[in-house]
């Protein structure tokens, strides 16, 4: 991720609809898996740390994070998060069988990440019968050149491809569902429009993360929050992201 994207993330992560909605979904997932105040949770690729902050406040203080960006880690520490280190998901600096759950949110698709190595590392640091939680972007046809250059991510996934990768590493899928289903048509239309816009090759690539008017931001959050409640009862067959909840076999 470009360094200026970390600053944007830090400034928006606590209020932006997408982050608020996703982090609320992840809290529901952790609670459904029985995580409590004694649980140890790893956020591998923690960005600027808002997900960690919410887990620490709502579930357990034993939450640890790593990110390959020193600037991202510095911003995490600005949030008051102590258990942070500069490291790659390709080489996680924790002992085997350490965590009750290890999550990696929108990381596997990044260009610097070696899929097989990262999944093997996530499995290694989780305790026997512990959980690996992944969120990845869905559908190759949703690739956006500007956005993915800015976040340095060139992969998107189908459910079958992700499931195959997990089976290869003996990570048992407990649940796999799409996310952001209701907003998929709008996301697709926006991405297609961006891809057809003329851009100078010298333009500094920017992600789609930018402040929105309050009414729009809150409206989008309420759509995602309604979907969060629906996810407590069922899986979604389509959506712009995929959530995989897995158990160490």
Model-derived features: positions:
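Conserved N-terminal segment of class I S-adenosyl-L-methionine
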Residues: 1-91, 95, 101-105, 119, ...
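Short, glycine-/aromatic-enriched active-site segment of Class I SAM-dependent methyltransferases
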Residues: 9-10, 133-155, 161-164
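Short N-terminal helix/helix-N-cap motif within the alpha/beta-hydrolase-1
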Residues: 50, 112-116, 144
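Residues lining the SAM
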Residues: 105-108, 135
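A short glycine-rich, Lys/Arg-flanked "PGG" loop and its adjoining helix->strand segment in the class I
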Residues: 116-131
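Conserved S-adenosyl-L-methionine
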Residues: 171-181
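A C-terminal cap/extension of S-adenosyl-L-methionine-dependent methyltransferases
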Residues: 183-249
